[in-house]
Amino acid sequence: SCLVGQGAYATILNDWIVVTSGRDRCQLFDKKTGRFIRSVGHVGEDPEGYSDVHGGWQNPYTGQLSFHGWKNEIVVYGADGRFDHIWTPSVSADEFPAMGVFDYLDADLIAGYYSATDSLPARIALFRGDEIVRVESLPVGQEGDKAITPDDIVSISVLKDGGDGLAFIKYKDGRSAIYPLGNSCFWHAGKDLYFRQSYNDTIYRVSAAKELQPVRVLDLGVYSWSYNERFEDKKDAIYPTKFM
């Protein structure tokens, strides 16, 4: 606990346990012995600094760790703790609450999800470095969020106690909303990458060779929320952040 601190979140990267915590640290531990190995990178506005330890991803094919940097940049480190490079996605997300989240597909390809706005549909993009391999709109009807201005907001609270974190926003018109701050839509099973959009009932497989392939449909039942209901205060409702 003296090394990690509160709000720890652990994932596996090859032979290491990767732990991020509220102390803005990313640390590697030996998967077999639990022994501390090293810290990776740091939060800072210098050329090798990232903006947050939360919301990044690790690629077992390359042994690299990716963190959100500044101005739409992704800061990449090797598991040896050395800074590797900065990657700037060729497709940028609109202003908050629109978001772009990323995960690896294989050693060369990165998948990105861009949420819908009032002018653009939600999209999945595949990148190979600076090359855009494919951009695909999600095959579901949806409404998008308009950009938020400070004049619209009464209060903002941010929870970062483990995981990627959530932003709680209360608006002047009486509405409220919760927005995930990291990757809540991609996950891996074996060598396959899967995707599920918040509030949607369909799970898709992401592939380099094919368009999005629906593989499962969830019966959301009472957890199915219409777009307008997502902004209502409900004391008897639980926000469905993830279905795995």
Can you say where each PLM-predicted feature lies in the sequence?
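Surface-exposed loop/turn elements that mediate protein-protein interactions on large endomembrane-trafficking
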Residues: 1, 25-43, 73-91, 121-177, ...
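Beta-strand-rich domains and repeat architectures in extracellular enzymes and scaffolds
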Residues: 1-25, 54-55
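Short loop/turn positions that demarcate and connect the beta-strands within blades
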Residues: 2-4, 49-53, 95-97, 179-180
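Structural signature of eukaryotic scaffold interfaces centered on beta-propeller domains
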Residues: 7-11, 54-61, 100-107, 115-116, ...
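Short beta-strand elements that form the blades of beta-propeller/WD-repeat-like
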Residues: 13-21, 63-69, 75, 107-119, ...
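Blade-loop segments of beta-propeller domains
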Residues: 35-71, 87-95
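Long, hydrophobic, well-ordered secondary-structure blocks that form the structural core
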Residues: 74-75, 85-113
